[in-house]
Curated annotation (Swiss-Prot):
Residues 19-34 have a biased composition (Polar residues). GO terms for cellular component: cytoplasm; nuclear membrane. Keywords: Cytoplasm, Nucleus, Protein transport, Transport. InterPro entries: Cut8/Sts1_fam, Cut8/Sts1_sf. It is found in: Cytoplasm; Nucleus. Gene3D superfamilies: Tethering factor for nuclear proteasome Cut8/Sts1 (1.20.58.1590). The keyword Cytoplasm applies. GO terms for biological process: nuclear protein quality control by the ubiquitin-proteasome system; proteasome localization; protein transport. It comes from Aspergillus oryzae (strain ATCC 42149 / RIB 40). Residues 52-65 have a biased composition (Low complexity). Belongs to the cut8/STS1 family. This is Tethering factor for nuclear proteasome sts1. The keyword Transferase does not apply.
Amino acid sequence: MNSLVATPPVPPHFYEYSRLSSSRPMSTPTYTPNSRKRKADDDGNDHDGRMSASPTSSPAFTPRSLPSRNMKRARPNVSGRPLSLPRLLETLDTDALRGVLRSMCERHPGLVDEVVHTAPRPSVSSALQVLRNYQSTLQSSFPLGGNPASDYAYNRVRQPLSNLLDALSDFTPHFLPPNEIQPSLSLNYLDGATEIIHALPRWHTPQNNIERDSAYDEICKAWILVIREAAKRGGGIQLQYGGWDQKLAKHNQNSGGKLQAAVNELGASLGWMHGPETQSHASPGGNDFGSIREQLLSGTYGLGTPVKVGPW
């Protein structure tokens, strides 16, 4: 039976290899992808892949770090705390802020000068707006119905009327020389302040009109002071612009002649206006002077005058 089973033939070189290398262990080579030989087409593909990949150190593809978001961290412990000064001032309106400053100046008198020098200079429009606010308060204080010129109405509006007159007395010196050096600002303020005085109520009782007459007297003195100061600057050229002669004459008419002294001062300063009568019945000399003045302002003076040539 054994003779019938044939053993597979073994090549003779296999036995020779086993006999020669039996003294040392034979290591079987392990297959790795990198150990095999690469073909020419593999080298070309690998080269193309390396060329297509951009290096990480290329300046055109330098990775940029995104800016970190400055997010406020949540406070671990939530507790109440007062507002900071800037946030507190944002919640105050004009009246509340004015009250805070007034209270601080009363408790610390040394702050008065600092506040005065730090605060911006009030303009003509802002000052007149304050006076108009007092005027609106006065008008709203009149009782409904009845006689608005009676003693009862006067007693009802006496305090708002006093507040308006006090504010007028405080603001007027601020816009007078030498505190105000620009005559145009002084004239504009006096124009608006005089209109407010015109709107003051007239009372049946003459004694109640003393305050109104005093206001006209003070504003007339202010007009005279500003006119004299403006006449010293540029030969009174500031008074000739804006039609101040007509405005002052109208104010004098609305006041019942209480500003006549200011009208006379303006006429004396200009030299061509001598009161309201001469405006309607002006002399030929006054008209000639006014015509010359208009020619000087328009730049046409002397265009038709012949010029002599040669010895005089």
